[in-house]
């Protein structure tokens, strides 16, 4: 019999034929072996036991199937029924996804909490992922009856919220001649909005479509990415940029700030939509996201303030939820991201953390008695990671009108003890193009974001050169000089520890002081202040320009004075005479972007000119 919760929550109806059933032979944690499953397919969705627990077939041998169950298996016994559904694990895609929170297999947590009245998810619960009764404002495009339409064509617009319009596309595998298209009005997800005829067969479609999570959604072609992912974090935007459609990894030990960087990207990046997957991380981190995001606002180009939650979907699969569902949560998240990409949007997907996903793979692999590889992880770990990260990219979308979309994947990795030679980290680094390596020592010094500028890298710098040339022709040279200064500081630190600062040449003292400026007042950023939580790219460029300009002018002044008979210019003299300008360099980060771009650029230009005037006056004095 179906189970009832509060008189409303019912599980799968069990009036199917007996031939659709197998029976449980063995239970080992989340892994169940069932017999009598002849004809079943790999990755087919099944319902296990009298509670109808959701499971997925991961191995077939003869008529026995090995199933990973996405819910707690306590209470399952031998000979319990296993019902086949004849479909793979799929997600529902349609209006209502944004602003929602799902678990790893796309069950809506708010709805379950409201209906069951419990803080925990009842076992075997079956609730539609999207509300089928909610009415949506449907506005058809230029298609009329008699037109030919193919998979991926956008045939209507649905008003999802004040931030985003939901563009309704025909499922990728559909095509035909339109025999009916719904007029403008309000419709639910159960209502037919378009009917097609192909080779004499009529098919009707609603605004809802279903897609198997392990199958990438088809695209017309892949494109080279050339637009930066602006995160609002200076160290990432200026030194190690990613692109819209890129792949990034954030490895770091516990307490280094991976989650804060992931959340900052969700809040402030220039993406149109964000899918945040909490995969096996602490439950209170997801709770923090749920409390913070609805209160956070973003300012649109027309000056409107909108809630960040309106462009965000959360997939919560915390560490106390069943292990097997962690694997599903990553695929659920990327499929939702691909759905919005197909509308022509730029989507970011945060996976926090892929290490927990790999640990779930390791546990299931151990239960299946597979041969372990490095650190007990399965031999196919790298292949699974690659197949996930390869679903990122900038694409030309299927169907018309012609449009481009992108999925950017940012995966946090938690290597034990911060050891980057860990199998998950090394497999991830062989795939991703951007590496934002977090450093425990920087985090202990309270330098956040604790991205180590000596080990991090980005392979997208060349792809973004044309963008930088248009934005600011000087930026590439300034950035190269800043990197040289930071690298030179690292080389000089050993000498300083041996002989002290005073024994250094004047040029080296200037290098050390400039590197300190870059480290403490440029790369470090306070995520909890209104002026520094988000740094627009123009502010990042101007701050770096002024610091490097100070470095160049100071070096030139010292070199010129060295070849003359007058008073020698030393670093101590520069700092003493130009202390006010030095203080203004340090204070650049306190300029609030809320004042507007023109006001801030004016202030930065004035500082640039004042630096020129200050050094000119100093050289005149010492002649």
Curated annotation (Swiss-Prot):
Key word ATP-binding present: yes
Record keywords, A-Z: ATP-binding, Hydrogen ion transport, Ion transport, Membrane, Nucleotide-binding, Translocase, Transport, Vacuole
Enzyme class: translocase
Cross-referenced PROSITE patterns: ATPASE_ALPHA_BETA (PS00152)
Residue numbers binding ATP: 252-259
Catalytic activity field: ATP + H2O + 4 H(+)(in) = ADP + phosphate + 5 H(+)(out)
Pfam families, A to Z: ATP-synt_ab, ATP-synt_ab_N, ATP-synt_ab_Xtn, ATP-synt_VA_C
Keyword Iron-sulfur attached: no
E.C. designation(s): 7.1.2.2
Swiss-Prot/TrEMBL GO biological process terms: ATP metabolic process; Golgi organization; pollen development
Record membrane topology: Peripheral membrane protein
PANTHER family: H(+)-TRANSPORTING TWO-SECTOR ATPASE, V-TYPE PROTON ATPASE CATALYTIC SUBUNIT A
Subunit structure: V-ATPase is a heteromultimeric enzyme composed of a peripheral catalytic V1 complex (components A to H) attached to an integral membrane V0 proton pore complex (components: a, c, c'', d and e). Binds to the deubiquitinating enzyme AMSH3.
Function: Catalytic subunit of the peripheral V1 complex of vacuolar ATPase. V-ATPase vacuolar ATPase is responsible for acidifying a variety of intracellular compartments in eukaryotic cells.
Family assignment from sequence similarity: Belongs to the ATPase alpha/beta chains family.
Name of the protein in its database record: V-type proton ATPase catalytic subunit A
Name of the gene: VHA-A
């Amino acid at each position: 019999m179906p189970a009832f919760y509060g008189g409303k929550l019912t599980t799968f109806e069990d009036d199917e034929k007996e031939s659709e059933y197998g029976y449980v032979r063995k239970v080992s944690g989340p892994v169940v072996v069932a017999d009598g499953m002849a004809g079943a397919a790999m990755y087919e969705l099944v319902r296990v036991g009298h509670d109808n627990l959701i499971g997925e077939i991961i191995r077939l041998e003869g008529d026995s199937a090995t199933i990973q169950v996405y819910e707690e298996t306590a209470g399952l016994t031998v000979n319990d029924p296993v019902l086949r559904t004849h479909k793979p694990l799929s997600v529902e895609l349609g209006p209502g996804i944004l602003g929602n929170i799902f678990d790893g297999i796309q069950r809506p947590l708010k709805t379950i909490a409201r209906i069951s009245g419990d803080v925990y998810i009842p076992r075997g619960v079956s609730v539609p992922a999207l509300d089928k009764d909610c009415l949506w404002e449907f506005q058809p495009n230029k298609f009329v009856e008699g037109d030919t339409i193919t998979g991926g064509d956008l045939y209507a617009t649905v008003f999802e919220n004040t931030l985003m319009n939901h563009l309704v596309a025909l499922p990728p595998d559909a095509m035909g001649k339109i025999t009916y298209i719904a007029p403008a009005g309000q419709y639910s997800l159960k209502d037919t909005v378009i009917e097609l005829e192909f080779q004499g067969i009529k098919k009707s479609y609603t605004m809802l479509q279903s897609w198997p999570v392990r199958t990438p959604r088809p695209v017309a072609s892949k494109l080279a990415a050339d637009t930066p992912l602006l995160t609002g974090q200076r160290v990432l935007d200026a030194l190690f940029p990613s692109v819209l459609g890129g792949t990034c990894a954030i490895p770091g030990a516990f307490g280094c700030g991976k989650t804060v960087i992931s959340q900052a990207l969700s809040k402030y990046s220039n993406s149109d939509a964000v899918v945040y997957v909490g995969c096996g991380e602490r439950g209170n981190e997801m709770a923090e996201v749920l409390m913070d995001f609805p209160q956070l606002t973003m300012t649109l180009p027309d000056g409107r303030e909108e809630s960040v939650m309106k462009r965000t979907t959360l997939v919560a699969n915390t560490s106390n939820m069943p292990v097997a569902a962690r694997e599903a949560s990553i695929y659920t998240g990327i499929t939702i991201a691909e759905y919005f990409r197909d509308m022509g949007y730029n989507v970011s997907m945060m996976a926090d953390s892929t290490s927990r996903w790999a640990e779930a793979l390791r546990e299931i692999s151990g239960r299946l008695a597979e041969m372990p590889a490095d650190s007990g992880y399965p031999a196919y770990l790298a292949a699974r990671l690659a197949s996930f990260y390869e679903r990122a990219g900038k694409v030309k979308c299927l169907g018309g009108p012609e449009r481009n979309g992108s999925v950017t994947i940012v995966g946090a990795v938690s290597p034990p003890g911060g050891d980057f030679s860990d199998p998950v980290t090394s497999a991830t680094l062989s795939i991703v193009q951007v590496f934002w390596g977090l450093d425990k020592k920087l985090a202990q010094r309270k330098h956040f974001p604790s991205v180590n500028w000596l080990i991090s890298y980005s392979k997208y710098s060349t792809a973004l050169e044309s963008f930088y040339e248009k934005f600011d022709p000087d930026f590439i040279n300034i950035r190269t000089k800043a990197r040289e200064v930071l690298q030179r500081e690292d080389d000089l630190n050993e000498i300083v520890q041996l002989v002290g600062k005073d024994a250094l040449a004047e040029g080296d003292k200037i290098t050390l002081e400039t590197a300190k400026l870059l480290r403490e007042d440029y790369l470090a950023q306070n995520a909890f202040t209104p002026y520094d939580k988000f740094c627009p790219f123009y502010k990042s460029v101007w701050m770096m320009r002024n610091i490097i300009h100070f470095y160049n002018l100071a070096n030139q002044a010292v070199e010129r004075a060295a070849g003359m008979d007058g008073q020698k210019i030393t670093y101590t003299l520069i700092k003493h005479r130009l202390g006010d300008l030095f203080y203004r360099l340090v204070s650049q980060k306190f300029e609030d972007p809320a004042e507007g771009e023109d006001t801030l650029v004016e202030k930065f230009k004035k500082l640039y000119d004042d630096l020129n005037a200050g050094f000119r006056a100093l050289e005149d004095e010492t002649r």
